[in-house]
UniProtKB/Swiss-Prot annotation:
Record's comment describing the protein's domains: The Asp-Asp-Xaa-Xaa-Asp/Glu (DDXXD/E) motif is important for the catalytic activity, presumably through binding to Mg(2+).
Cellular localisation: Plastid, Chloroplast
Keyword RNA-binding: no
Protein name: Ent-atiserene synthase KSL1, chloroplastic
Residue interval of the organelle targeting sequence: 1-48
Residue positions of motif DDXXD motif: 547-551
Gene Ontology molecular function: any one: terpene synthase activity
Organism field: Isodon japonicus (Scutellaria japonica)
Amino acid sequence: LVKDDMSLILSSFSLFRSSRSSPASASLAGSGHPRTTPPKIASLQSPMVEETKERIAKLFKKKEVSRSTYDTAWVGMVPSPFSSEEPCFPDCLFWLLQNQCPDGSWAQPHHHSLSPSLLNKDVLSSTLASILALQKWGLGQRHIAKGLHFLELNFASATDNSQITPLGFDIVFPAMLDYAADLSLNLRLDPTTLNDLMNRRDSELKRCTENGSAETEVYLAYIGEGMGKLHDWETVMKYQRKNGSLFNSPSTTAAAFIALGNSDCLKYLNSALKKFGSAVPAVYPLDIYSQLCIVDNLERLGISRFFSTEIQSVLDDTYRCWLQGDEEIFMDASTCGLAFRTLRMNGYKVTSDSFIKVVQDCFSSSSPGHMRDVNTTLELYRASELMLYPHEIELEKQNSRLRSLLEQELSGGSIQSSQLNAEVKQALDYPFYAVLDRMAKKKTIEHYNIDDSRILKTSFCLPSFGNKDLLSLSVQDYNRCQAIHREELREFDRWFVENRLDELEFARHKSAYYYCYFAAAATFFAPELSDARMSWAKNALMTTMVDDLFDVTGSVEEMKNLIQLVELWDVDVSTECRSHKVQILFSALKRTICEVGDRAHQLQGRSIRSHIIVIWLDLLHSMMKEVEWSRDKFVPTMDEYVSNAYVSFALGPIVLPALYLVGPKLSEEMVNHSEYHNLFKLMSMCGRLLNDIRGYEREHDDGKLNAMSLYIMNNGGEITPEVAIMEIKSWNDRQRRELLRLVLEEKSVIPKACKDLFWHMCSVVHLFYNKDDGFWSQELIEVVNQVIHQPILLSHF
């Protein structure tokens, strides 16, 4: 960023203050020209790393989910359709007999690895359900005795508010205790805890009865096994899905079959056991969600580029299911939200109508019924941020609604997981378009939970929820890229000194080069993009210094002189430059343009130096026009202002030359195409509008016009700055959404890798202007150090 506020902020940071040369530049001085190819850093091609990649690739074929003791026990209670005296699924009972823990519980492996004290309610519920199943059929008396002993010892956990409470626990667990009494099981339970538990059940049922909402009806149907004779099961069956299940829940479906003997319920249970063997998961089917979770994790951890073939296959399959209206997507809110977000961000044409209907059903509709938790609400919120079209007003409304719900969860302190709490706060503080890629990925890696699980009526895990191989590869890749970035920063430091830029008196910019490079490394980080990062960073610093000449320190003669020098190009700087300052600026600019142009020539197979010169001249002329307007007190129309201001925001020299260095060939026809210019204008307008909002008071005091002041003038001066800010922000929202739509457009003239750079810069400007006081000093210092200088060191390795 090049405007005053960024420069002033940077100049105050002790980290960025620089003398004649920094320690890095001093050690590198005189060592030759900056390197334009990626430094040689240890690659990720070792046999061990390749084996890790192979194991990750196999995750796409393992469509598995952890077995649920709780659900398996309920399926085990199902009687044979031919005889109520015999179990329909004896294999489930044998599985229970074989999987009791030494302490008498029926905990699963993830219960032990995931802070067991927080999952005791889940373990109690699973253990009691297993006891009921065995007792019903007169099996495993020794197992039952051990299980009862465990329940008696740990019963206090049933009312412990510090532990994670499974969905419906306060109704289902007491109901199972009643069922235990019916089966003549003698439980010696603490009477105080038991009374407390029963009171909670009564209060919860009373609340649900008085509420009477459709959402409550869905909730009670989902926990149907805990309602027993209180349920009108015929009414509950309206939630039955095409696969025969109720909510894709084996336990609810088993309870429904026990009550009604519905043949489709039995078909569903048979299909689940056919797929998983002797035990069932907590949710089935979950294939689409599981696959999308792998894709999402790979993208969030920064290693998706290693699995492009597998990811493409998942996305194609998901898109096909989306178009077919597959229940696995549209009957599960989390899956729908993740599918909508992933497909949209990967360029698939998915309308928001179906997604909006799922959101509405999830929170208010009586049909077909969706169960939700904070994870689901967060997933829906992230998906609802992806507004691309002007007509998506309802999507915007749902985004506001979901945001409000998450804020309530956050302020109410109801999120029991500290990690989830942090995720929600991050999502609310930083919208997806105001997050620098590398910052987000580092945070994801550092907070990645290899023992992650989800909890509805019971907890469950997927291979993609917490995977050591994903974490291992992402850490190695991050640290490798970071080592390359540190080497590039040293080269950048050397370039700064070799071009004598440290001699200029506006020394506040001697520090800005750290930020100029950081913005590139934090957005497009892959090793092969080294040339593009260096072009971005060098041109960013040059625009900052040129902007300072035009806006702060230069005379009109110096400004005109610099423009003339660039136009003439082949000049004798010792005689043609009006000042030492102009001589240094022009010499550095010329050398940088030639360096970037030469490297781009090698990649593109044609000369593009003249185009880079034109890009710079466009910027210089637009800056000169602003100076002349201010000098002559000329008041442009809004159209006149905009046509000049988006260029003068100075993103052209930063982004446009770098497009030639990201890989794809860019023909002259492409760079002259309207799509190319639309991408540039939309990106630049976002920065310009946000800058004008931030700089309104300062520029107003200086007698300078911007979009804010012109908007107020065009409305007769009758609207307040606050109203104008709302209008300009709305304008910016439209520009940003249109930019993202173009970037994601599949049929495009400009290659996707090039379009991504426009979006990366858009994210940079939105991050800087996300807070009312900007990207403040201490946070910037911390982030730069983390992303560039601090490797990830985790105790897992």
